[in-house]
Amino acid sequence: MSVEPNQIRNILTLRYDPSQNSLLPALQWNDFSINTHDPSLEHIEKYIENYISKKVENSDVKRISLALSGGVDSSLILAFIRNTLPELKIDTISVKFADSIDETKTAEKIAEHLEVDHHVIFLENYLRDLPKAISITKLPFWDLHWYYVAKKAQTFSKYLAAGDGGDEVFGGYTFRYAKFLSLTNPKSTALEKAKAYLKCHERDSVTDQEEVFGEHITFSWNLIYEQILPYFDNSLSVLDQVLLADYNGKLMYNFSPINNKINNYFELTSITPLLSNDIISYATNLQSKYKYDEINNIGKIPLHQLLKKYNLDSLILNTKQGFSVNTLNLWKSYAQKLCKDYLSDSRVVKDGWINGDWIKKYIDRNDLDVRYVNKFLGLLAFEVWYRLFVSKEMKSETNLN
């Protein structure tokens, strides 16, 4: 395996690479053929129920696992599975990260309400199994919590369900929408909107991003803008342009391929009802005002309405992070030392892929902004990937302690 400069530039700037293969259909701006009809909860219910029934059509299936964060999407899918297949035994799984916001109590309440067995994975050192996870995905991503979910799930069942796609398809990234709308106006050009969009994803890059790379990787922001521009150079509404960019970004080229590779490794069948062709087609034809309430900054409106129908709305947190580790605290506990261990004698620096001076400038600092911590985690993942597949000096069983 060799280094693809464009891939590394994209992953370390956008946290995804559009050259990757994805199981999801790519969307173009003209796929958003907006109709004028009000949203139909019955249609959404039918599509989800049909998908679940077809995926678990084998009568021998007695048990299924589900990743339950306690948020809207995973809770709703749990309710649908419980109602569609009431005889099925369900094991829900949540992840609790050390020194991070603990949302597992919410997930436990939802699991108890729907009478399913709930399991919590506690991760003291989130990065410990990074070599093993990267050996499976074969991509230099550090945010691989799905490895732990799938590893646990395969002890219960060969089916793993999730609420993946709800945010991208039904408009759940409300904090980004509000910021994007504040940065743009009706006269904004496609380039101005592309730049504003990236400002809404600031945690993926650093202020001196151009200094991160070595001599073998050409970086300019124009190369990044060129990949984003097509999503904003069309006649769609501003919010639909953002939804188009979100769908064709991390969902297509990070979350979906990563989760599928990990599930395949553990011989798990993925069940993702919110990413069925029917749901994607229906949601993209739904006017954005029916997905996102700009005045009250509320997204995923149809899914919230379904939660209320299933009497789950009172159990869901108003602000939900999902499976999210506090990287600032992770830096203090494990990540800084691990980065020093692996990046102080870095193979990717020696071979000209990453700028060693940039690493030296920041690695000893204890007051790093979260953007720089995240960048170091990305560099650590790249270093691990490089030692696994290029220099081949690291074993996948290596633990980062």
Walk through the language-model features, giving the residues of each.
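Active-site-adjacent bridging/hinge elements
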Residues: I121-D129, M252-P257, K350-K361
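PAPS-dependent sulfotransferase catalytic core
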Residues: N311-D369
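Short hydrophobic-aromatic micro-motifs
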Residues: P5, L12-R15, L23, L160-A162, ...
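Short Ser/Thr-interspersed hydrophobic loop/turn segments at strand-loop and sheet-helix junctions
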Residues: Y247-K261, Y282-A283, A381
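Bilobed periplasmic-binding protein-like "clamshell/Venus-flytrap" ligand-binding domains
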Residues: L239-K250, F376
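Acidic, carboxylate-rich catalytic segments that either coordinate divalent cations
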Residues: E4-Q7, V348-N401
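ATP-dependent adenylate-handling active sites, centered on carboxylate activation for C-N bond formation
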Residues: W29-L239, K261-Y310, T327-L328, K375, ...
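N-terminal glutamine amidotransferase
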Residues: M1-N35, E49-S53, W146, F382
